[in-house]
Amino acid sequence: AHSYNPQAADMAYALDPFNMTWVDGGRYAILGPSGCGKTTMLNIMSGIVQPSEGKLLFDGVDVTTLSTSERNIAQVFQFPVIYGTMSVEQNLAFPLVCRNYEKSVIDAKVQEVAEALSLQGLLKKSASRLTADQKQLISLGRGLVRDDVAAVLMDEPLTVIDPDLKFRLRRQLKEINQKYRSTLIYVTHDQNEAMTFAENIIVMDAGKIVQVGSPAELFDRPKTTFVGYFIGAPAMNFFECQAAGGHKLSIGSAEIMAGTDLSKVGSAPLKLGIRSEYIRIVEAKGANTFTAQVQRVEDMGNYKLVTAVFEGHVIKVKVERDIAVPADRVELQLPAENCCVYAADILVS
């Protein structure tokens, strides 16, 4: 945990107390809105910030009070940090030169990293003359060139990168992770970056870790309504509802069978959540169906996005382009296995 003013009578946490284990060689993303504590967490790992409470362990060894240089951590910041008076080759070699590696070892390692990052043709160029994405690759390469780096921490590293290049760079990062088995921890507020890069995502809000899981877990079973809103485009559909006994609930006049036992939810306000990808357009009434009024149908390129209304509830439905959508009314079905029920905004398991 960390507070920037731990002596205050009304002390507020920038990072609430938590326990978490990071697996060596893993590929992680820390995802959340601005100011939620992402960078504070990253800076505690690297040693830039010392936590006001708790310990940081590497392989069981307490490193909480160690300096950044003693932790063998590489950190890539939002804006590229390079040595403009040096060539690309000299930039990549610099961490090894500082540790008095033999020249033959330095040359071999620089060539290996340059090949992994597609920088071979730029090694003799001045680093100051490169594009923003090339400079950021140099920053990353300086972290990878050392064999003793325990983890590479990246704080929104693609902010300055042209959108067309971001996908390619994320792919390169994944290839580097697979080749070197370096632990990569990537901070971002962009869900698309997190979902396409990470094996596991840590979702944060207001200094708290609200869910840790794979992209599929976060998408299919968000543990809070916040995660449901934050992950996905469009966000998860949510309907205020009431328990109707057993696994049944009611959304207005519609009766829905959910895959969750609701007998112990008590008096907490309930919401049903379901992704737009899982709602079906059907031809006839049946289990878990209701009739909604079509507001608009948008062609999104590789799919259609239907916006419909049922008794005041706005519903987003993704359908394949070749599916015909009625102009006025549509019968919608909510499959029970895809329904998530939330009591006081927390997933009922």
Feature annotation, model-predicted:
Residues 1, 11-23, 54:
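Conserved beta-strand
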Residues 72, 82-223:
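ABC ATPase nucleotide-binding domains
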Residues 28-29, 75:
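Short beta-strand immediately N-terminal to the Walker A/P-loop
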Residues 31-33:
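The feature captures the beta-strand-to-loop junction immediately N-terminal to the Walker
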Residues 46:
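Helix-to-loop junction immediately C-terminal to a conserved catalytic motif
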Residues 52-55, 206:
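Conserved coupling/switch loops of ABC nucleotide-binding domains, chiefly the family-specific signature
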Residues 54-62:
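Conserved ABC transporter NBD signature motif
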Residues 236-238, 246-349:
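Non-catalytic connector elements of ABC transporters
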